[in-house]
């Protein structure tokens, strides 16, 4: 019965979609389910994909004669008026520590460098190692500590009061627990894994090492990811994994877009480990389709001539109508 041929593909796709949905993986189309198993390169956006996307304070290092409470209080006063993403991490840490709250005046933000403000008769400054070291003397010990933090993929923020260094607050976007495992699974499946990030190369390589990604492309701004994906597509079939908002152009440019928000494949659980799961499901579905088609063709190549009596002159084979009806149903059931 040719019904088996008609059922071979749609039944497998329906089952694949159902299994994906059950595990929080939504395939937008049947094509995305089929194509996911063919990808050769997976490009992972760092923020929100490999990392949590929510920077947190990881280290607080005070200068001699300065208490952690003082450092956190003055840092809070400065960062409270900042719009920088890392400021939220400092504010959250300070609020959790129930630090003293001060109000500053004459607040100034210096993009790419740091902050400055007046608190009573004191001048407070905060910012990058490069910026603060140009304003005041940084001891060899704290300079070394700041370098070590940067090598670990963290961002060291230095703070001063009247030109005296108070200490360092390190902020980092923490790696998701399942990221290293997911990267390893993809690599074991023969897929090349690439990390895209806007961070500097040293920080990017440190984060990549934590996640197990050797192929890191640093200094990539959101609007530059599309061109990176275009270049990667010349080397193989590419899947881009990122959020559905900032990475929209890159997700569209890739052969397969996988996102936490909206794309060809949507990850409802926001877990990177669902990426290799989606690839495995796609490959299993394709394998099932091929098996279904093989058995459907094999079954009908033998059965149709038998039902038509073609084999009677050659082998004397005949088919009882009752068995023919049963065989027709069995072919669809097997698929």
Please tell me what each predicted stretch does.
Residues 1-5, 300:
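Hydrophobic alpha-helical segments characteristic of transmembrane helices
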Residues 5-78, 232, 242, 250:
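Conserved catalytic phosphorylation-site environment of P-type ATPases
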Residues 9, 197-199, 331:
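Conserved phosphate-coupling serine/threonine residues in phosphotransfer and NTP-handling enzymes
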Residues 19, 133, 191, 252-254, ...:
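Membrane-embedded alpha-helical bundles of multi-pass transporters
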Residues 27, 39, 119-121, 153-155, ...:
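Conserved ATP-binding TGD loop and adjacent catalytic N/P-domain core of P-type ATPases
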Residues 37-44, 50-83, 113-194, 335:
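ATP-driven catalytic headpiece of P-type ATPases
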Residues 41, 59, 103-106, 215, ...:
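Extracellular/lumenal ectodomain signal focusing on beta-strand-rich modules
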Residues 89-100:
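A short beta-strand->alpha-helix segment at the C-terminal rim
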